Amino acid sequence: MTRPVALITGARRGIGRAIGVALAKAGHDIAFTDIAEDEAVAEASKLFEAEGAQARFFRHDVAAVASHAGLVADVKAAFGRLDLFVSNAGIGAPIRGDMLEITEESFDLVMDVNLRGAAFLSQEVARVMLVDRPQRPAIVFVTSASTELVSIDRAQYCVSKLGLSMWAKALAVRLAPEGIPVFEVRPGIIRTDMTAKVAAKYDARIADGLIPAGRWGEGEDVAAAVAALTSGQFAYATGTVVNVDGGLLIPRL
């Protein structure tokens, strides 16, 4: 019997790579994408293969909606199946600053990747799953604590993630009668290349009590949630939101 296949976007490093390792450990072969191809791709492939997975990289820009059908077809051609989709690729605000100064170009870029691209790629995957009927399908969206927390210096990022959260809920309702669960994982402050530039800021805020757990999150924390949700042990759950944030989103006085 062939292993189930997971397609993970934005997985050559960071959270996506950690998710790939976790799903490889759980018995999946890994199809992974990113917008760039560099030494990190080979490193990621080695990590996935070390867990017994077949791994294949597909260079892909999630914002290029016209290329989505080709990507999914290429994954099917390479592996013969597609069982799980993890929408992880995303970008931050190109320039942080006053939201009254956000340009149309900056706003559109973030929306094209984080919302529009992610939504339409999940649409393509869902269509294929409805035809193929994999035994244990699932779709997971990696969003952000910024679905609930406002950052006025990167408002377009917050809007994009909140929009994707609503898309995940709508897709969960649409696919529930078809037996395809849809989940959302909301990372909090996670140690990645994207957050490296603001590490000093959040080191100080964490020390001041911003996060009840008292530490940064790691990519492996997010990956553990994705692996659990897609394990097949939550057969009556869909539309579920899991916060992986050390308690950041808990309202406190």
List each model region and its residues:
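Short, small/polar-rich loop/turn modules that mediate ligand/substrate recognition or access, typified
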Residues: 176, 181, 237-239
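Conserved glycine-rich cofactor-binding loop
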Residues: 12-13
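Alpha-helical segment proximal to the catalytic Tyr-Lys
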Residues: 127, 173-174, 235
